[in-house]
Amino acid sequence: MEDILFVYENQLPDNFSENVEKAGITPKVLTLSDELNFDKIDAVAYFGENKDNLKTVVEKAVESGVKRAVYVASAICYFNRRNTGQNLEKHPFVKNQTDCENAILAFSDKISVSVAEIPLAYPVPKEIFTIGGVPALKFRNFYLTFDGGYPEISDESAAESVLSVILNGKNGVIYPLCDKNAKFKAMLNEKYPDVKVYEFPEELWWVLALMAKSSLKKAGLTAKTNIKTLYKKDLYENYFFDDTEVRKALGYK
């Protein structure tokens, strides 16, 4: 098999290397030179370096004769495409992921490039009311959450789907990947089967979110997450996707 440049920022599942070797791909570990800067601490400055570092790596790969590149990006790029017009300067992580994705796709006229977008494995930010990583409120005999959720992917599916992009992905094509769209109520029911879970109206959640923001402000703190991301339209209607066609295109179930 030809050499493939494989770049990722998000953590890959433990069984990824095993699946890669089963497919007959032998990974080569490369050490990046000192010219790549990974010493930034400030989020905006640090993320700004990622795009430049990625471009440098791809340029060197092209110079060395590599014909294929696969970049593992975040599903948050997919959501950003669904919600155009956002000021990404206020969202450095989203901007970083989007800039990196666009940077490697810009090489599609020189090298075959495919992008795999997988859901984040990070929990909901701590400043949001959560139970077991799910936005919810805890009462004595029940939990309250709202009609929202986000896409999930298992370690096995992440390995299989990313490997499918490596083997079958087309040049210049982005592949959003997931197992299912998990609703918050279903997550809580699965984690806490002995506790009743109810969904409350989005208007009530909005009021609670504003109260949380006000409490943070009084404490001299600022919410790292835009308060609007707590709204149903953002977390439910816009943050689910169907990857049925992607699975067909890549040839995996």
Locate each region found by the language model.
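Amphipathic terminal alpha-helices
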Residues: 2, 17-20, 38, 236-253
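N-terminal Rossmann/SDR dinucleotide-binding element
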Residues: 1-43, 52
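Residue-level signal for the nucleotide or nucleotide-sugar donor/cofactor binding architecture
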Residues: 95, 150-153, 241
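NAD(P)-dependent short-chain dehydrogenase/reductase
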Residues: 112-157
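Catalytic helix-loop patch of NAD(P)-dependent Rossmann-fold dehydrogenases
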Residues: 80-122, 142
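Conserved Rossmann-fold NAD(P)-dependent oxidoreductase catalytic core, especially the SDR/UDP-sugar
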Residues: 43, 56-95, 114
